[in-house]
């Protein structure tokens, strides 16, 4: 019979042991724009393509990299509306933790809370899985951290990772270039070079976004002028 008769059932396993709706959610991630993250010795960088649906869209209104807390940022591949829902839920969790314990939420705990929300949407009736994967970058008492969270709710800590439509080329490139003693500026250069692998058209500060966090524990998104400077350095 195959898996097709189970493709509309969220809570029923197919004979091959898959939840087919999660497979479809991963397909949505795989067709999204390429995003990547690199953990350096002194910080973390996340970067993504930012292709606009039309030249008439105001590029300033499209922000793929977001703050979750002052020291945690996130980027996605997949469906933008789903990402915004998860950002809102994650920020609420972080605010509740801060209010209760009077200290910022650890990166690992916020990732776990977000992954729990995503997992609950794989086993509940009347909902569908989130069609996004997330890369979460943070810096806390345990140092720089990079996590990837997938639609199934699974999450892992990574030294460097990529997701989206160019994932295989990007991961191959990262495997060749990554070193554990890499510093933050080197990681930004590597992130740009990784995005250039398979990039359609000319890469510029208008069609990529980069976020970073260092030992100051302040996550920020680079300005177009800063991205232009880094692009000039890797030419």
Curated annotation (Swiss-Prot):
Q: Signal peptide position in this chain?
A: none
Q: Which UniProt keywords apply?
A: Cytoplasm, Isopeptide bond, Nucleus, Proteasome, Ubl conjugation
Q: Note the Pfam families from the entry.
A: Proteasome (PF00227), Proteasome_A_N (PF10584)
One GO term of the cellular component aspect?
cytosolic ribosome
The answer to whether the entry has keyword Nucleus is: yes
The UniProt function text for this chain reads:
The proteasome is a multicatalytic proteinase complex which is characterized by its ability to cleave peptides with Arg, Phe, Tyr, Leu, and Glu adjacent to the leaving group at neutral or slightly basic pH. The proteasome has an ATP-dependent proteolytic activity.
Q: Which PANTHER family match?
A: PROTEASOME SUBUNIT ALPHA/BETA
Q: Which family does it belong to?
A: Belongs to the peptidase T1A family.
Complex and partners: Component of the 20S core complex of the 26S proteasome. The 26S proteasome is composed of a core protease (CP), known as the 20S proteasome, capped at one or both ends by the 19S regulatory particle (RP/PA700). The 20S proteasome core is composed of 28 subunits that are arranged in four stacked rings, resulting in a barrel-shaped structure. The two end rings are each formed by seven alpha subunits, and the two central rings are each formed by seven beta subunits. The catalytic chamber with the active sites is on the inside of the barrel.
This chain belongs to the protein called: Proteasome subunit alpha type-2-A
The gene is: PAB1
